[in-house]
């Protein structure tokens, strides 16, 4: 007899492919500030800390292509490439740094 543990997850065998078939954008990002900057998986990358230097136009409506609930940390002086994926669904961007607060469909 097997016993279930409250909250236990029993996944199927195999791998889960994240953002399968989604278009990605690769950007070179540099932390030009004197402090570490961390960006979460679903943060609107366009509105990230001004201490990060990258092509912001290419990041509009996109988030990091990393597993949900994780983040990327940029130490002062760090430079690396990141992959971004477009937001899905209604593509409404509200909050963050308040730069958009509207639908991207317009």
Curated annotation (Swiss-Prot):
Its EC number(s): 3.5.1.5
Catalytic activity: urea + 2 H2O + H(+) = hydrogencarbonate + 2 NH4(+)
Superkingdom in the source lineage: Bacteria
GO molecular function, one term: urease activity
Pathway: Nitrogen metabolism; urea degradation; CO(2) and NH(3) from urea (urease route): step 1/1
Top-tier EC class: hydrolase
Major location (coarse): cytoplasm
Key words of the record: Cytoplasm, Hydrolase
Localization (cell): Cytoplasm
One CC-aspect GO term: urease complex
Pfam families listed in its UniProt record: Urease_beta
GO biological process, one term: urea catabolic process
Membership in a protein family: Belongs to the urease beta subunit family.
SUBUNIT field: Heterotrimer of UreA (gamma), UreB (beta) and UreC (alpha) subunits. Three heterotrimers associate to form the active enzyme.
Protein name, UniProt field: Urease subunit beta
């Amino acid at each position: 007899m097997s016993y279930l543990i409250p909250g236990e997850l029993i996944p199927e065998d195999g791998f889960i492919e994240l953002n399968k078939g989604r278009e990605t954008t690769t950007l070179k990002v540099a932390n030009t500030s004197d402090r570490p900057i961390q960006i979460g998986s679903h943060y609107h990358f366009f509105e990230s800390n001004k201490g990060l230097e990258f092509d912001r136009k290419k990041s509009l409506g996109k988030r990091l292509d990393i597993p949900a609930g994780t983040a990327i940390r940029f130490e002062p002086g760090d430079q690396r490439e990141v992959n971004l994926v477009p937001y899905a669904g209604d593509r409404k961007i509200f909050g963050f740094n308040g730069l958009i607060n509207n639908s991207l469909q317009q």
